[in-house]
Amino acid sequence: MLAKRIIPCLDVDNGRVVKGVQFLDIRDAGDPVEVARRYNEQGADEITFLDITATHHGRDTTYRTVERMAESVFVPLTVGGGVRKVEDIRLLLNAGADKVSINSAAVFNPEFVQEASQRFGAQCIVVAIDAKKTGDNTWEIFTHGGRKPTGIDALEWSVKMAEYGAGELLVTSMDADGTKAGYDIALMREINNRVSIPTIASGGVGNLQHMADGILKGGADAVLAASIFHFGQHTIPEAKQFLAAQGIEMRL
C-alpha cells in the first residue's frame, strides 16, 4: 500500500504568502520560499503553491518564486493558479515545479487537460475541483475561486477529468473551506468510488482527526491543509505520528 501524503498549501499573492504564517523563527513571514523550506525540513511529503495573483506582471514573480523554491525544497512541488495554456505548464515545469494544477481552465476547455496530459505526462497534471453541495449527494463545480457556478455535476466531472488524463484530483469543498469543521467526507467518498486516480482532500481541516477521517472515511490518498500548519497549531511530524497511530501508512 502506498504511503498517504500530507501536503501543506501556500496561497501566494505577488510573491507573498497571504494566509498568515506564524512560524516564530521566520523573520519575514511573507516569503513563500522560507515557509516552504520550513515545511520541507518538517518532513512534508509534498508542497502545494497556489498563485492567486491575477495580473500578468505577477506571473513573472511566480516563475522566480518557483525557481527559488525548487532550489531549496526537495519534495514534490505542485504549482497552480492562472494556468490556462500549455505554455504556462511548460514554464512552470521548467522553473522547477513537479506538478501543475489546472482549475478554471479545465472547465472552460476540458481538452486542455487531455493535451497537457499527452504532452507532459499524467503524473504532472493535477486537476483542481472546487465543489459546492447542492442537494443530497449532489455537488456543483464552481470557478473563479468559488464565486461562479457552472451547472456541472462534480461527480460526473471527476470521472471525465480522470478519463481526460488527470493524474490526480485536488478536491476542495467550498462549503467546508475555512470552517475548521473537517473535509466534506461524503464528497470525497463519492468521488473515490468513481475514479481510480489518487485524490487529495482539501478544505476544512481544524484538527488532526479531520486529516485521519479524510483518509480513513473519505478514501483520500493525500490530505492538504493550510492554517492548521501556518499558525503553528500543529507540526507536520505531529500530524504524521497521529495518522500513523491510527494505522495509516505514513513516511515518518
Curated annotation (Swiss-Prot):
Pathway membership: Amino-acid biosynthesis; L-histidine biosynthesis; L-histidine from 5-phospho-alpha-D-ribose 1-diphosphate: step 5/9
Presence of the UniProt keyword Cytoplasm in the record: yes
Presence of keyword Iron: no
InterPro entries linked: Aldolase_TIM (IPR013785), His_biosynth (IPR006062), HisF (IPR004651), IGPS_HisA/HisF (IPR050064), RibuloseP-bd_barrel (IPR011060)
Enzyme type, top EC level: lyase
A GO biological-process term: L-histidine biosynthetic process
Its EC number(s): 4.3.2.10
SUPFAM superfamilies with a match to the protein in the record: Ribulose-phoshate binding barrel
Assembly, per entry: Heterodimer of HisH and HisF.
Function: IGPS catalyzes the conversion of PRFAR and glutamine to IGP, AICAR and glutamate. The HisF subunit catalyzes the cyclization activity that produces IGP and AICAR from PRFAR using the ammonia provided by the HisH subunit.
Record protein name field: Imidazole glycerol phosphate synthase subunit HisF
Organism: Acinetobacter baylyi (strain ATCC 33305 / BD413 / ADP1)
Lineage of origin: Bacteria, Pseudomonadati, Pseudomonadota, Gammaproteobacteria, Moraxellales
Gene name in the database record: hisF
